Amino acid sequence: YGGVFVAVETSADDQSETVIGYALAASWAYFAQWPIFPFMLARLSALDFEGRAITEANSFQYGPVCVDAAYRGLGVFPRLFETMRLGMCERYPIGVTFINRLNPHSYHAHTKKLGMTVIDEFEFKGRPYYGLAFDMARSVLG
């Protein structure tokens, strides 16, 4: 369950669209094909988010996300995230993602712009990561 959520810009003459960003979100079962996700899933039972247990059934994995450099800082990221949130919130109350701890730009974007909460810190294959969670009932658009 999930999908690719795409942000597009329509040309002034409405004749074409240009992809300016995307976000991927899906069930843990979908992401299980990549080794980091079963590793993260195994850690969930020891974690909670805002007093709620995080499980495979009540959470999903969000990311990666990318916004074209020419459109960064223009509000595309929160609007793209909000589109994803609306597409996933009826099935999952909690979203989970991870960010490399060596990527302060992504950390800032997710914690400050979107209000995500760090719930875990871990290493996988020698790389340090934050695990973050977010409440799917809460809009990021204010």
Show where each model-derived region lies.
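Conserved GNAT acetyl-CoA-binding A-motif
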Residues: 58-62, 88-101
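Conserved acyl-donor/pantetheine-binding loop and adjacent beta-alpha core of acyl/acetyltransferases
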Residues: 24-64
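Conserved beta-strand-loop-alpha-helix junction that forms the acyl-donor binding cleft
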Residues: 63-72, 97-107
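Conserved active-site alpha-helix within GNAT-family acetyltransferase domains
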Residues: 78, 101-120
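Conserved acetyl-CoA-binding loop-helix of GNAT-fold acetyltransferases
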Residues: 64-67, 72-87, 112
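Conserved beta-hairpin
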Residues: 2-23, 38-41
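C-terminal "cap" of GNAT-fold acetyltransferases
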Residues: 123-142
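Short hydrophobic/aromatic beta-strand element in the GNAT-like acyltransferase core
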Residues: 2-6, 22, 59, 64, ...
